[in-house]
Amino acid sequence: ERQFRRWLRASVNKRRLGWLDKGQEWTYWRVPPKILVERQVAEGRALVDMSVRVFDGEAFLLNCALNFKTEASTDAYFWPDGTLVAEQKEATLPAHFAVPASFHRAVRVAERLAQGFDYLRVDFLTDGEALFAGEITCFPASGLGPDDWFMQQMYRRWLDALSLSWALSTPQPWPRRLYLAAFRRWLTARRTELASEPTPVPRRANSD
């Protein structure tokens, strides 16, 4: 028991201090560290990890993953209608993979939860039928994701919904409001700039 307590203390301290590292959610640093023990929901069955990217209540992309966060992890992106995104270069799910029966319910639940937010990623686990709630985050990967096709598309949609963010939708004290006034001017200019550029048309992969 004494050895376990030492290991537990070292593990918790490492995780707690790691929140300030690059690639971590630094905004959580004031949250008191706690241990959360979750009951096992799969009972030996394989689970699909689904994460839904939502802008102001409208789902844009979903990622489905098997064996998530293991060496055997495979994943791919899908549109909210369940078709595979053609633009992705590194889809690794098996060719026979089909979206779970709970896929469309996950979309509806995520859209309802994210209504009124500029951006949320809403995560679920599913055994195919049952749907288990997971993490909800405002900035996946601490906002340090790769500058790929997905990020470029999400960037456009995020700018369109950004006025819903807490900083821009809530009166702010000085001097923060000075910065936000300048940011609003930049946001308007950036939206105008993007509106003059051609928007790539997303493609659906062939079902066969």
Located regions from the model:
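Catalytic cores of PAPS-dependent sulfotransferases
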Residues: 46-47, 51-67, 71, 102-119, ...
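Amphipathic repeat-derived elements
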Residues: 19-47, 95-111, 171-176, 184-197
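Low-complexity, flexible helical/coil segments
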Residues: 69-74, 87-102, 156-162, 169-176
